């Protein structure tokens, strides 16, 4: 009788602990927020692949990325074409030397077109616009807005807050896969997040 009672008590305790743990486990949104908050910034090299809906590699590229949270970033593509994306937290510049043009946006405008911005500011209200799931170190974000033109955005970030890369899955099935290498933690210098418009280039100011 004592053995039966002990077995029942043990089972009840295990069940209670299991329910307690589940109730207090961090949600994917909270876990993502926590991991992104661990480091104030980083710099890295990146490699990029664009995969067609049919599974073919249609483009490969590489470059460098620098981030200082909140909201500062410098994204420099060196191949296949040279271009530069810089944000000072308020204004975003996109410079294409090949066509000699600079496009200027408010950073708030760019989130829909460039979900990468989500990585840089880690703003709690942003995550409310997504259904977030977690599988290991990969977090998948799906927009909740019915009229959103975004597909899925996947962030690969480990338990120490080191971002390993991210993926953009378009609604038509095309994928952009970005992998970070040679990651160096720490905020880059502030002057890395300023941009001076070169002389003679065309300026397309979309802030108005």
UniProtKB/Swiss-Prot annotation:
SS bonds (residue pairs): none
UniProt subcellular location: Periplasm
InterPro entries named in the record: LolA/LolB/LppX, OM_lipoprot_carrier_LolA-like, OM_lipoprot_carrier_LolA_Pbac
GO CC field: outer membrane-bounded periplasmic space
Keywords of this entry: Chaperone, Periplasm, Protein transport, Signal, Transport
Highest taxon of source: Bacteria
A Pfam family matched in the record: LolA
Gene Ontology biological process terms from the UniProt entry: lipoprotein localization to outer membrane; lipoprotein transport
Signal peptide: 1-25
The protein's assembly and partners: Monomer.
Family: Belongs to the LolA family.
Function noted in UniProt: Participates in the translocation of lipoproteins from the inner membrane to the outer membrane. Only forms a complex with a lipoprotein if the residue after the N-terminal Cys is not an aspartate (The Asp acts as a targeting signal to indicate that the lipoprotein should stay in the inner membrane).
Protein's UniProt name: Outer-membrane lipoprotein carrier protein
